[in-house]
Each structure stands twice: as C-alpha cells, then as structure tokens.
C-alpha cells in the first residue's frame, strides 16, 4: 500500500491475508469464518505490540507521513468562524504559515500554524511548510494583534525548519525568528503551542514560546533532523535511525526532560488514521489548558512563561 511505513509491514501483510480470505469466503462453499476470526484476533495483538513499542525512528516516520493532518485540517474541526489573515505588511504573504482569528467554544482566539501541502503542487505553494522571514513576521503581526485585543494565542507547529535559502537569509531569517521569541516572551495573553508533526529547530521555536507546550504522541521536536545529525556526527546520513534514538526527539523524551507540558494521545497507527478522533483529543487538551491559563493575570502569564523557559537546559561553571 502507498504511504505505509516499514515497521507496519507485518500488519499490512496480515491485513492482506485476511482480506483475501474474506473474499474467498464469499464465493466458496468452504466456511472460513473461524479462521478469519482467529487471524483478526492475531492482528489486534500484533497491532497492539507494534504500535506500543515504536522506536524514535518509527515515530519520526509517522510524524512525516504525507497524509498526516495539517494545521488547516485541525482548524476546520476545532474552531468556529475562522477568518484567515494574510501578509506581514513588510514584504509579502508566506503560505507556509497560516493564521487568523476564530472562536473556540465561544472564546475569541488567534490561531497560527505551519502549513504543509497535500500534494506536489500544494507543497510547492506552501514551500513544504518551511517559512521565509515574512511567514514569521506575519505570525508575529497576528500575535501582537491578539495581545492588543486580549485574545489567547494557539499555535500549531509542523515544519522541517525555517527555509535556509539565500532569499530568506537576505531578508533576515534569523532576526525574524529571534524577534518572535523576544516578543512572545512578553505577551500578556495565554499562548498554547502544540507540535502536531515535525518540530524542526528555529522554524518551530518561532511559534513555540508558549505558556504550555504539548506534543502529539508521535510528533518529534529537535534542533536538526536525524539525517542531518547523522551526516554531521558520522559523515553518513544513512545512520539517521541511530541518530534518532540518540537525539531524544520524541514526545515522551521531551516530556521527561521537562521541556513540554503534556503528551496528546494519538489514534492507533497515527493521526492520519482518524482525523476527527485526533481533533477531539486536541480539543480536550486546548480546553483544559485554556481554562487553567485564563485564570492567570497578565503579570502571572509573563512570569510563568519566563520561569518555564529559564528552567530548560543545563549549564556548568568552570
């Protein structure tokens, strides 16, 4: 099957066998119902075993799955009256980041997120979800607007990273990311950041300075891709699987390290298996987080955000 992952092969082979037996059972005089039921029970156990023992590399593949739900997919199910806003008022409109105003269960909010494409044409239009500086500046414009009008900010993170092209550098890519971090640190409204797929380096951080940060169960968050890390460390990108295990990039790793505030469960096999069910899990998390953060004063929100990031990391003195 297209877009299926290597670690799922045993599941797919067994599913194919069950499908063949069911087809044969419909046209044959031989009753294979018992055999089919046994295989279906075996399939359930196999799925439980494989999906509960996924490696970091397995999860990385799920996070990159071409059918994985995007920011706009979730916006359509989670928010009402979404109105997309465009442009950074400086250079242009970057389709790799989408954002606008909406309501969440009656509460006015600003929603911003990276947006990957659904096919080749769309990916070219969206630059594969890798923003230029104008994308980050558009996001900051919307965040400042939210701060002015007292709207909570909800960010969806899903990018390989900021676009590393020449034009992006000429227009101040690093400054745009740094400016977002600087300005977000002093926002007087709640900021919730959710990694829904791949959280790649500075491109992810530019939407990631939240009061609370959550990750989907199979999402990843890292300073560099496993392929890039392997190429730098061992001069061999084919060792990406080894790098993924060493880098501690999974939702479980980051929660254990105290970088994120929670893990959002995924449907069996990954978010792409059931968009509606996955959106409901995100709905629960946003509801709980908003309820907690909206009880904070403006000063408490700024202080909590500052303290959260101050605690991240380790340093030594000589």
Curated annotation (Swiss-Prot):
Domain CoA carboxyltransferase C-terminal residue range list: 38-292
EC number assigned by the record: 2.1.3.15
Main location group: cytoplasm
Alphabetized InterPro entries for the sequence: Acetyl_CoA_COase_a_su (IPR001095), ClpP/crotonase-like_dom_sf (IPR029045), COA_CT_C (IPR011763)
Subcellular location(s) per record: Cytoplasm
EC class (word): transferase
PROSITE patterns from the UniProt entry: COA_CT_CTER
UniProt keyword list: ATP-binding, Cytoplasm, Fatty acid biosynthesis, Fatty acid metabolism, Lipid biosynthesis, Lipid metabolism, Nucleotide-binding, Transferase
Gene Ontology cellular-component annotations: acetyl-CoA carboxylase complex
Subunit record text: Acetyl-CoA carboxylase is a heterohexamer composed of biotin carboxyl carrier protein (AccB), biotin carboxylase (AccC) and two subunits each of ACCase subunit alpha (AccA) and ACCase subunit beta (AccD).
Similarity section: Belongs to the AccA family.
Gene for this chain: accA
Gene Ontology terms, MF aspect: acetyl-CoA carboxylase activity; ATP binding; carboxyl- or carbamoyltransferase activity
Catalyzed reactions per annotation: N(6)-carboxybiotinyl-L-lysyl-[protein] + acetyl-CoA = N(6)-biotinyl-L-lysyl-[protein] + malonyl-CoA
GO biological process: fatty acid biosynthetic process; malonyl-CoA biosynthetic process
Gene3D superfamilies linked to this entry: 2-enoyl-CoA Hydratase, Chain A, domain 1
Primary role: Component of the acetyl coenzyme A carboxylase (ACC) complex. First, biotin carboxylase catalyzes the carboxylation of biotin on its carrier protein (BCCP) and then the CO(2) group is transferred by the carboxyltransferase to acetyl-CoA to form malonyl-CoA.
The name this protein goes by in its record: Acetyl-coenzyme A carboxylase carboxyl transferase subunit alpha
Recorded metabolic or biological pathway in which this protein acts: Lipid metabolism; malonyl-CoA biosynthesis; malonyl-CoA from acetyl-CoA: step 1/1
Keyword Transcription regulation assigned: no
């Amino acid at each position: 099957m297209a877009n299926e992952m290597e670690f799922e092969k045993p599941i797919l082979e067994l599913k194919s066998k069950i499908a063949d037996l069911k087809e044969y059972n419909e046209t044959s005089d031989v009753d294979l119902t018992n055999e089919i039921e046994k295989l279906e029970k075996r399939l359930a156990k196999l799925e439980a075993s494989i999906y509960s023992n996924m490696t970091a590399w397995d999860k990385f593949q799920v996070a990159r799955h071409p059918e994985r739900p995007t920011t706009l997919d979730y916006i359509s199910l989670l928010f009402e009256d979404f109105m997309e806003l465009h442009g950074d008022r400086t250079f242009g409109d970057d389709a790799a980041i989408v954002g606008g105003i909406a309501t969440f269960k009656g509460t006015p909010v600003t929603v911003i997120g990276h947006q990957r494409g659904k096919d080749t044409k769309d990916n070219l239009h969206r630059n594969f979800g890798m923003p230029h500086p104008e994308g980050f500046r558009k996001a900051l414009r919307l965040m400042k607007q939210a701060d002015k009008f007292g709207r909570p900010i909800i960010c969806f993170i899903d990018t390989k990273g900021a676009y590393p092209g020449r034009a992006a550098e000429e227009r101040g890519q690093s400054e745009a990311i740094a400016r977002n971090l600087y300005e977000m640190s002093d926002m007087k409204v709640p900021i919730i950041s959710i990694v829904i797929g791949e959280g790649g380096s500075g491109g992810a951080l530019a939407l990631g300075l939240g009061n609370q940060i959550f990750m989907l169960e199979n999402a990843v968050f890292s300073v560099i891709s496993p392929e890039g890390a392997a190429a730098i460390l061992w001069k061999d990108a084919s060792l990406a699987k080894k790098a993924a295990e060493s880098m501690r990039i999974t939702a479980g790793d980051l929660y254990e390290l105290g970088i994120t505030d929670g893990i959002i469960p995924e449907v069996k096999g990954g978010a792409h298996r059931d968009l509606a069910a996955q959106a409901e899990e995100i709905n629960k998390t946003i509801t709980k987080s908003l309820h907690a953060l909206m009880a904070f004063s403006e000063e408490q929100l700024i202080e909590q955000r500052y303290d959260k990031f101050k605690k991240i990391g380790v340093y030594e003195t000589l």
